[in-house]
Amino acid sequence: MFKVDNSDLRRWTGDVTRGLRDLRAPLTAAGNVIEAKVAEQFQREVDPDGDAWEPLSPDTLKNKEGGSILVKTGALRDSFEYEVDGDTLTVSSSSPVFEAHDQGIPPIPQRQILGLNAEDKNQIAGIVKGYVRGSKGRRR
């Protein structure tokens, strides 16, 4: 799990966000971006930086009936959700095996799922900046 909170937004967009009271719209848009990114990572079998996940071991391949890395039933892939609460966006997984795979707990190799690369951060900053520009005329 990770959070994008108001301190991150202020750093990304400067002091202009201080005048904003309701960040739900840009945080929801950012949550949608992250959700789509996670789905793409499962499809491409890559971490947030685009590096390939470690291949399955021969033992795992023997016991696995098709499917891709980290997808046996789809439960882990489909377990990600985000929540906007005030000025905080929380992205998490309800899967009990998420942390073992994301962090790598031996003998399971790390196959990072959640995280933001520089391009993701720029995209989210662009969403917030667009919202800030659109709100300037609405502030009191």
Residue positions per predicted region:
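Short, Lys/Arg-rich flexible segments
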Residues: 1-140
